């Protein structure tokens, strides 16, 4: 007797009652997403992270961009939900890949729910976000979504590769990585909004610069901000062994020195060693280089919107302030 002629219960090694319930043979016992008890368990890492207050920079930026794009509120809410799910999922995965201990001042999700459950929940959130796209009723949204998710993972992959291989990238390579990784969700949000808008305008170049600015500022604050220390831990990028923007500049400022690369390889949690590393980075002028690069990129961002009316230019200023880059430059 071949498998195709076996009774269903014998074929699947399950009692016939399981077959009758619809648990196999191509049908779930319940439609997707209706078992509230299971969903609560599955969503727990996401819901935990969402209870920790954040700045909601992306949501506020979308509100600001909508002063230009003027899409219906219900479509804006859908796009916000897509970005929120993707951002939360990426944080869950980032904290695992970076061996982080704190997120916004509280224990990371995987230290509470476990690594396996947290990874599964993050993957689930990616598909929840994709499912939300149905509500936009726009076929092009799926292409944009897939394109930006691929870029995001490409950027993350290079960041991890450099870290784990102890290979210091060039600044140009860093900008490409950040454009894919950090800029991805900013760009996805604006591209989806542009698809839903009747306005004929392209803010992607502006958003590309904002993504790089946001990451350089984050790299700077990781090693310079007391508030960042409270939320994420002291000099976390050094413990992670990450090639952040000031670290890349510092290493390349004196290629003959192995001091900083050696510290990165140690994945040290010793605060005295990290303080020494920060003083070394300061001695190579790398924090000053960060500030100069931020000023330069702020100028580039303003050039992207230079032809706007004074009223629209105020919106651009507000968006810059949201990423910590007001009229006076870098803010903490």
From Swiss-Prot:
Mg(2+) 3 binds at residue 218. Mg(2+) 2 binds at residues 94, 98. Its EC number is 2.5.1.-, 2.5.1.1, 2.5.1.29, 2.5.1.10. The record marks 126 as: Important for determining product chain length. Its cofactor is Mg(2+). Isopentenyl diphosphate binds at residues 55, 58, 87, 104. Dimethylallyl diphosphate binds at residues 103, 181-182, 215, 222, 232, 242. Diterpenoid pyrones display various biological activities and subglutinol A shows insecticidal and anti-HIV activities. The keyword Lyase does not apply. Pfam families: polyprenyl_synt (PF00348). It is an enzyme of class 2 (transferase). Belongs to the FPP/GGPP synthase family. This is Geranylgeranyl pyrophosphate synthase dpasD. It comes from Apiospora sacchari.
């Amino acid at each position: 007797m071949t498998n195709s002629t076996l009774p269903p219960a014998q074929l699947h090694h399950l009692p016939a009652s399981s077959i009758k319930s619809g648990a196999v043979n191509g049908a779930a016992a319940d439609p997707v997403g209706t078992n509230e008890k299971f969903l609560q368990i599955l969503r727990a890492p996401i819901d935990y992270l969402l209870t920790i207050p954040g700045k909601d920079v992306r949501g506020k930026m979308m509100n600001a961009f909508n002063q230009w794009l003027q899409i219906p509120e219900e479509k804006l809410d859908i796009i916000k939900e897509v970005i929120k799910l993707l951002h939360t999922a990426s944080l869950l995965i980032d904290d695992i890949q970076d061996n982080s201990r704190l997120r916004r001042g509280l224990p990371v999700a995987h230290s509470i729910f476990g690594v396996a459950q947290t990874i599964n929940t993050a993957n689930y959130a990616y598909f929840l976000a994709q499912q939300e796209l149905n509500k936009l009723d726009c076929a092009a949204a799926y292409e944009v979504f897939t394109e930006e998710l691929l870029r995001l993972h490409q950027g993350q992959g290079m960041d991890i590769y450099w870290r784990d291989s102890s290979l210091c990238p060039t600044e140009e390579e860093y900008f490409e990585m950040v454009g894919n990784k950090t800029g991805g969700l900013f760009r996805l949000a604006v591209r989806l909004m542009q698809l839903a808008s009747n306005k004929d305008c392209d803010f992607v170049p502006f958003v590309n610069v904002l993504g790089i600015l946001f990451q350089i500022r984050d790299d700077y604050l990781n090693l310079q901000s007391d508030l960042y220390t409270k939320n994420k831990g002291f000099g976390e990028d050094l413990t992670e062994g990450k090639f952040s923007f000031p670290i890349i500049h510092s290493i390349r400022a004196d290629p003959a020195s192995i001091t900083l690369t050696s510290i990165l390889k140690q994945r040290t949690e010793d605060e005295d060693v990290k303080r020494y590393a920060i003083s070394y980075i300061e001695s190579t002028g790398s924090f000053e280089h960060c500030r100069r690069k931020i000023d330069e990129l702020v100028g580039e961002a303003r050039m992207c919107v230079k032809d706007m009316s004074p009223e629209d230019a105020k919106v651009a200023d507000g968006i810059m302030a949201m990423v910590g880059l007001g009229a006076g430059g870098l803010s903490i």
